[in-house]
Amino acid sequence: MKLSRRDFMKANAAVAAAAAAGLTIPTVVQAAAGSADSIKWDKAPCRFCGTGCGVLVGTQNGRIVASQGDPEAAVNRGLSCIKGYFLPKIMYGKDRLNQPLLRMKDGQYHKEGEFTPVSWQQAFDIMAEKFKQALKEKGPEAVGMFGSGQWTVWEGYAAAKLLKAGLRSNNLDPNARHCMASAVVGFMRTFGMDEPMGCYDDIEQADAFVLWGSNMAEMHPILWSRITDRRLSNEKVNVSVLSTFEHRSFELADNGMVFTPQTDLAIMNYIANYIIQNNAVDQDFLNRHVNFRRGATDIGYGLRPTDPLEKAAKNPGSDASDPMSFEEYKAFVADYTLEKTAKMSGVPEDQLEALAKLYADPNIKVVSYWTMGFNQHTRGVWANNLCYNLHLLTGKISKPGCGPFSLTGQPSACGTAREVGTFAHRLPADMVVTNEKHRQTAEQKWQLPAGTIPAKVGLHAVAQDRALKDGTLNAYWVMCNNNMQAGPNINEDRMPGWRDARNFVVVSDPYPTVSALAADLILPTAMWVEKEGAYGNAERRTQFWRQQVKAPGEAKSDLWQLVEFSKRFTVEEVWPAELLAQKPEYRGKTLYDVLFANGEVNKYPLTEIPADQLNDEARDFGFYLQKGLFEEYAGFGRGHGHDLAPFDSYHQARGLRWPVVEGKETLWRYREGTDPYVKAGEEVRFYGKPDGKAVIFALPFEPAAESPDKEYDLWLSTGRVLEHWHTGSMTRRVPELHRAFPQAVVFIHPLDAKSRNLRRGEKVRVLSRRGELISTVETRGRNRPPRGLVYMPFFDAAQLVNNLTLDATDPLSKEVDFKKCAVKLEKV
């Protein structure tokens, strides 16, 4: 599309609107000055967070030269945050990788060799050799992959097919394990289905917003602009923010609360108690739509079995629960009184009571938002469940302006990591590998012999680190993430495992990240609009984009790498004789033939792609690969509450929210009149559960795995900042973003700094029981910790904060608690 006068006027009008929200929009005028007629524009979702903003991408002479917020995108309405403003520049870092690099010595692969350019043929030769060796010597459990919530939908789906069906290994896990796993398990326990029931439209209809461990002002700034607009345009709207430290979201808060780490569990039980004691329960809703259960307690911390904390746990890893009555639940939460909760949490009584009244008042529509503060938590699943309790008790759920909403941090943590089944325990559309019927469904759709997919849950992210160190996971492929920097406790398991001579580690990445430089083989990867893609955002909105430029040099998309690598294996090399006996026609065929040239994936011809439209993968393989993968995948969910629209619909729309039935998207799930799966007269049906009822869980406060003591006397919480995304592998290569926040700092209370004889701007050594780093003291600015807590972002590769963190996880979700460990400071 060409830049028109109408587009010019739209862009300038949007700038004025953005200024009021404290946001920026790159104007088309600046990007296209003097050459408007030669810029081609096309739509795409933003490459960064899970909000799913729509952008217009301007290309010229084979390069991205501009971007702007898409005025037709319902999510962001033409706005861009500061990261979105600079999207074009993430593609063109000076150190962009453009050919495979293998550690070599004397012309051969060597674990301690220097990175040396090789061809794709050579790269896949050594990869295939190492994967086949691991399979032959130890079987499918010796191979694995760590994927991403930044994969496109079809990349994640192809990875699931290759690992779980082809190589017969469930050792596939995404980096979304580190951010969204607790939300997944929380949804499944309470509702029997994953992902939020509401949508962003709730913002304009809610009377109150409660943020639980979510700094939306910096992490989801476009959504925050909509909340800000709602709050400032209606004086009756209330914003409450809960966190373990003050941050920018507190600036809008009517009720900002800083609580002692881990005590959010107690606060939610207090609110439930308040609702019951003040007769604010929607009893009719409970009777018709809710069951009560008491969950197992003292479930451990996901550490190695030899750890003293695991040995001491009475029910390590238990997801068990027993039925209970409403009266029994009432008695359970009665222990969480206002006085007790205020003392535990450090939040004043009047603020706690004001918060409870929002949920209890039947005339106030409440939306609860959370991200990592809940999920990265040793009781993260419980935290999710307890928040659902509040909405279920009051009936404030699945209707406009009311509901619990788990926000996501990656662009397709929902659409790819969760929906297509790239977790070690999952298959597409909420199915799981431990369920025989689910495995049979997948095997039938994938045309596999019965028994191909293993029933055993694979290794989750932290378990992969431990298995690498222990030498039981030997061939390992990391795609579209920087886990050596982003994962916990780098020194004890991950780095030793990656550098163990028994193991061969491959990293696919556009840049030489900390992870890439720790690998044995680096594969150069196409980015964003250098390929055709699809993401699924936090409100169940699936969005497509077309390839708009070519990748540099020999860089190839993750999809191409996965599908091309499958050609290196014959079925005889990876499947036992008893499987082949069921499908003798597969003898002599490759995994590519069985998985991707199977009559389904390859049935859409190249003629469906316009002749002038870039699509490198499709033309390399000779068919419309992306469409074939999507339509095969979509077959899992259609008719089962996960309905996706036909492939071609998404290239026309600015995204559609599933389930999409008869061309109509669903804004609010489980509610009669808005969800096609709820029949007339049912009012509400939580159809993920066999009886259609959600579950309220009785779950207590339990302490963190590690707390400050006499020696390590401070809490450490980690996270992000507005200017950088995750490990900074993209944003730190944008000069403007790097200058805005060039290095990580330690945010600390001024009195804590003073008592340690530390001054702002001085160097300080931060130490935990696992490692140390040197950083800079910051006593001012956007983040204001209380006494006893310090905060550090993890974007800085020169300050690996995850040298400090503990690899304790929620035992149910296996998600790491990056928010709570103990550290001490030493003056340098």
From Swiss-Prot:
Gene Ontology MF term list: 4 iron, 4 sulfur cluster binding; electron transfer activity; iron ion binding; molybdenum ion binding; molybdopterin cofactor binding; nitrate reductase (cytochrome) activity
Q: How is it modified after translation?
A: Predicted to be exported by the Tat system. The position of the signal peptide cleavage has not been experimentally proven.
The residues that hold [4Fe-4S] cluster are 46, 49, 53, 81
User: Which ranges carry the 4Fe-4S Mo/W bis-MGD-type domain?
Assistant: 39-95
Provide the binding site for substrate: 794
Q: Provide GO CC annotations from the record.
A: membrane; nitrate reductase complex; periplasmic space
Among its keywords, does the record have Iron? yes
| Domain of life of the native organism | Bacteria
Q: Where in the cell is it found?
A: Periplasm
The catalysed reaction is: 2 Fe(II)-[cytochrome] + nitrate + 2 H(+) = 2 Fe(III)-[cytochrome] + nitrite + H2O
Q: How does it assemble?
A: Component of the periplasmic nitrate reductase NapAB complex composed of NapA and NapB.
Q: What is this protein called?
A: Periplasmic nitrate reductase
Species this protein is from: Serratia proteamaculans (strain 568)
